[in-house]
Amino acid sequence: VSIRAVMRVYAERSGDAGARTPKEIFEIAEGIRPGNREAAIAAFEELGEMAGDALASAITLIDGLIVIGGGLSGASKYILPVLLKEMNAQTGMMDGARFGRLQKEVYDLDDEKSFAGFARGEAVEVLVPGTNRKVGYDPCKRIGVTFSKQGANRSIAMGAYVFALNHLSK
């Protein structure tokens, strides 16, 4: 999962031996620059598939939102659908039984309808063992994926600012 992989896949699929940058490949995918549009889109889709596989493995270890940043995030419209498909994919057993590769549902937080499903949840009340008290519980396991819209420099600066504010009063 890298810019070099996007460049390699585009070169393999298009037959274009020129060293195209990911920005140029994105412009080809958008139809702004001449080149093999299908190969350009496929290069970003393959990145989405590989990133989805890696993130599906990583998210089994942590519980949190996934925010994807960096220069390739500009191509999110080509990457995200395949990434979500990979993360929400099924896997199977030798006997043919199928089940989700993750115990969680993965949601696109940049899509209004998907975000509504993520935010809604399925709250139910459960009895606290040994008491008569009930508490709210949401059995719906879910994870959200989004792309950074502000860039690494701004995100780091904002984080440092909030960190400093939190430590001024100490």
Residue ranges of model-derived segments:
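ATP-binding/phosphotransfer module of carbohydrate and carboxylate kinases, centering on a glycine-rich
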Residues: 1-170
